Amino acid sequence: MTESVDRQTAVLRLRGADDILILCHKNPDGDTIGCAGALYLALKALGKNAAILCSDTIPKMYDYMELRWFDGSFNPAFVVAVDVASIQLFGENNNVPQYAAHTNLCIDHHASNSGYAYETLLDPGAAAACEFLLDVIVDMGVTITPQIANCLYTGIATDTGCFKFASTTPRTHMAAARVMEAGADVEKLNARLFESRSHARITAERMAMESLEYYFNDLCAVICLTWDQIESSGVAGAELEDLTSLPRSIEGVEVGLTYRQQRDGSFRISVRTSGSIDACNIARRLGGGGHTRAAGCEISGNLDNAKHAVLEEVRKELQRCGLLDQDTG
């Protein structure tokens, strides 16, 4: 059982530690990578020995960050996880599980955090883990350099859909302003993160939209990508992250579901909602989690079974919110 700690306690733990291993979640996104990069640079500034480990390869779109990857050259004495809500989200590669099982400190913003770490610094009100990691680093006595600022801005911007998602608050904008003042190259970062699409990404998007289906009086829209389609398009996994916003962006749709088949045949399902519909309610009942407007889960089996399982939970949530008659099957 984890012990919840405040920011000052987390700062004391980080300042008192050395030989620190920073863990990201699998299928890494901008927030987990941005946190890892910013924390690594902060620890380096304090003279600490630190490195980063992830179960999956970091997408090339984030290669502007200064990251030191763990190569086994030291024995970690302190393990910190960033933006990882549950032990299952670490993945199985690169010996990550053996380190994740002994996570000393988790820094996270998911309300669904399972409490796997010995101590957890949790801020579910933050739109991104990078949003409040900024204050952690400042309290560590580290100056926010342009390099650290770039990492933090990456996490804040990507987890808010470039400040479009409902999770964005005045505090989010203030954190973004602070990292801009510290030297984050916002113009270049936004262009790289949001305004560039590869040919492979466009091909994958076309395939996904060709699979579009509607359910529950068009309140729910579903798109799917099989592993064969992902492979044939040549698209990198990170390029598909913002694909999850497409079905929800359709006029009149309250729930958008994106199914992405993984190499092992299982499906990674992203849930995006609006209004009173809680995406986390849907995902949690399927063993996943996340936020009110953005959540996800993984389901084994064929696509039809995966669709049925998630759509059943969507139906219950729509009925709970009074958007669907109770007798609608």
What are these regions (language model features)?
Residues 39-40, 96-99, 122-123, 174:
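Glycine-rich, phosphate-binding/catalytic loops in enzymes
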Residues 2-61, 70-76, 158-285, 290-329:
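Hydrophobic helix-and-loop "lid/oligomerization" segment in the mid-to-C-terminal part
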Residues 1-8, 96-105, 125-133:
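An acidic intrinsically disordered interaction segment
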Residues 5-9, 85, 137-139:
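Short, motif-level signal for alpha-helix interfacial/capping segments enriched in acidic residues
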Residues 110-175:
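Short alpha-helices
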Residues 53, 80, 103-107, 119-122, ...:
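Hydrophobic/aromatic beta-strand patches that form the interior of the parallel beta-sheet core
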Residues 63-119:
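Active-site cofactor/cluster-binding pocket
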Residues 68-70, 93-96, 120-123, 141-143, ...:
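A generic local secondary-structure boundary/capping motif
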